[in-house]
Amino acid sequence: MRHLKSGRRLGRKTSHREAMFRNMVTSLFAHEKITTTDAKAKEIRSVAEKMITLGKRGDLHSTRIAAAFIREKSVVTKLFSTIAPRYKERAGGYTRIIKVGSRNGDAAPMSIIELVEEEFTPKASRA
């Protein structure tokens, strides 16, 4: 039974899923915004927020843990030098997920996951 088992499998084996999360988090920090499916965005949110928390700690051990997860050294440097200091006063909630509709082809629900910089003001809805 599946009781109390957290996380989505996303139709992939464990190693494939973990590699995908590493790639997506690396891209998120490199570009500060990526478009992906809702389920993937919800899963990488927790991983990305843990990496930013490591960046806020800023010690050598945190740097090594982040470097073991993030695939590019330049992105690790960016995380510790520019991204983490941006959230020094914020206690969590470093990412935002915005739903953008469905993908052409398979109608998968798509989202944009981005790093929070300032307050989000949604567009006025046409009622």
From Swiss-Prot:
Keyword Ribonucleoprotein carried by entry: yes
Keyword flag Membrane: no
Family (UniProt): Belongs to the bacterial ribosomal protein bL17 family.
Keywords: Ribonucleoprotein, Ribosomal protein
HAMAP family associated with the record: Ribosomal_bL17 (MF_01368)
InterPro entries named in the record: Ribosomal_bL17, Ribosomal_bL17_CS, Ribosomal_bL17_sf
Known partners and oligomeric status: Part of the 50S ribosomal subunit. Contacts protein L32.
Any one Pfam family match given in the protein's UniProt record, by short name: Ribosomal_L17
One Gene Ontology term, aspect cellular component: cytosolic large ribosomal subunit
Any one Gene Ontology BP term: translation
GO molecular function: structural constituent of ribosome
Protein name: Large ribosomal subunit protein bL17
PROSITE patterns per the UniProt record, alphabetical: RIBOSOMAL_L17
